[in-house]
Amino acid sequence: MRPSGRALNEMRSVSIETGFTKHAEGSCLIKMGDTHVLCTATIEDRVPPFIKGSGLGWVTAEYGMLPRATNTRMRREAASGKQGGRTVEIQRLIGRALRAGVDRVALGERQITVDCDVLQADGGTRCASITGGWVALRLAVNKLMKAGDVTMDPLVDPVSAISCGIYAGQPVLDLDYPEDSEAGVDGNFIMTGSGKLIEVQMSAEGSVFSRDQMNELMDLAAKGTSELAEMQKAACA
């Protein structure tokens, strides 16, 4: 029995509110249960030096958590003068994931930065950031297309992410914090709307797992990301 009472293959309730901020070219507030993340996308007419003059675009991401996003206050990373290792890892993951769904030639030589700010955390913040980040990216690109700044849609496939794990001996979809903190196996799965894999992160937290168990988690992830892709499309319609 899951603490939330959800079925093993049931996600938390998900909502995506677009246009949450007025200044960013694309924005949304995504809620996956009690995990809430504000995602914004900013278009800039520049690219990193290593691709300047190549004609290729770039999508990157930044990630952060508000001090009271969790049950105890965290010190702002800006106050310490540097980002923590976890933050750097997650924002690189978000950037990699989103770029997998982008035709960088069609995007043209410009950069889109996706900022993901966790307002409240209850497990799965990186997955919510990727899923909401794609929505913000989609909305920003829509503005480029409407203005005629790009001639072809550079977004080739929706990108979303979901966590899966083994909790109390059972494979479960979309772990919240109580489950995540006690899971024997924990994994994050990033997939395209067409069902292709972008990245899989799995680790044995308390017990090792078999190939069959991994396949069960993969099936759950495919179900979850397919549902999220439909929600993304509906939010951007």
From Swiss-Prot:
Binding site for phosphate: 86, 124-126
GO terms, molecular function: 3'-5'-RNA exonuclease activity; tRNA binding; tRNA nucleotidyltransferase activity
Keywords recorded for this protein, A-Z: Nucleotidyltransferase, RNA-binding, rRNA processing, Transferase, tRNA processing, tRNA-binding
Coiled-coil annotated residue ranges, if any: none
Subunit: Homohexameric ring arranged as a trimer of dimers.
Family note: Belongs to the RNase PH family.
Top-rank EC class of the record's enzyme: transferase
Catalytic activity reported: tRNA(n+1) + phosphate = tRNA(n) + a ribonucleoside 5'-diphosphate
Assigned EC number: 2.7.7.56
Keyword Nucleotide-binding: no
Name listed for the protein in its UniProt record: Ribonuclease PH
Membrane spanning residue stretches: none
Functional summary from the UniProt entry: Phosphorolytic 3'-5' exoribonuclease that plays an important role in tRNA 3'-end maturation. Removes nucleotide residues following the 3'-CCA terminus of tRNAs; can also add nucleotides to the ends of RNA molecules by using nucleoside diphosphates as substrates, but this may not be physiologically important. Probably plays a role in initiation of 16S rRNA degradation (leading to ribosome degradation) during starvation.
Organism: Ruegeria sp. (strain TM1040)
CDD domains, per database record: RNase_PH_bact (cd11362)
PANTHER family: EXOSOME COMPLEX COMPONENT, EXOSOME COMPLEX COMPONENT RRP41
InterPro entries named in the record: ExoRNase_PH_dom1, ExoRNase_PH_dom2, ExoRNase_PH_dom2_sf, PNPase/RNase_PH_dom_sf, Ribosomal_Su5_D2-typ_SF, RNase_PH, RNase_PH_bac-type, RNase_PH_CS
